[in-house]
């Protein structure tokens, strides 16, 4: 579960970086 949460955070960051 913790790993899943971490993956979600990394995914969101990558998407945000791409948008910027």
Swiss-Prot record:
Keyword annotations from UniProtKB, A to Z: Bacterial flagellum, Periplasm
Subcellular location: Periplasmic flagellum; Periplasm
GO cellular component, as recorded: periplasmic flagellum
Main location, first listed in the record: periplasm
Subunit structure: The flagellum consists of an outer layer composed of repeating units of FlaA around a core that contains one or all of five antigenically related polypeptides.
Function field: Component of the core of the flagella.
Family listed: Belongs to the bacterial flagellin family.
Name of the featured protein: Flagellar filament 33 kDa core protein
